[in-house]
């Protein structure tokens, strides 16, 4: 069976302190990870800075972590979804 990138990624819904830390750990361990949050301005800042300066300042996101403000895209991209 051919590998499907959708099933290999994990989406974390919630970009607060716990959601960001969880997404960070998942990505750091080699899991393609998507992080979604409801505050579009905050999500844009995290995507631009590659870190969550509100909750985890100084922790640069791993390459495997993608921040996205589009809930539909984030949910559609992963088989595994964590809501925090």
Regions found by a protein language model. Give the residues of each.
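Rossmann-like NAD(P)-binding element
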Residues: 59-84
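NAD(P)+-binding Rossmann beta1-loop-alpha1 motif at the extreme N-terminus of oxidoreductases
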Residues: 2-59, 68-69
């Amino acid at each position: 069976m051919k590998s499907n990138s959708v099933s290999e990624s994990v989406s974390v819904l919630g970009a607060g302190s716990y959601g960001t830390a969880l997404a960070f750990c998942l990505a750091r361990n080699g899991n393609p990870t998507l992080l979604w949050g409801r505050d579009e301005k905050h999500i844009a800042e995290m995507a631009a800075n590659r870190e969550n300066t509100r909750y985890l300042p100084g922790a640069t996101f791993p390459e495997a972590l993608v921040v996205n403000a589009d809930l539909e895209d984030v949910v559609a991209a992963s088989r595994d979804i964590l809501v925090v």
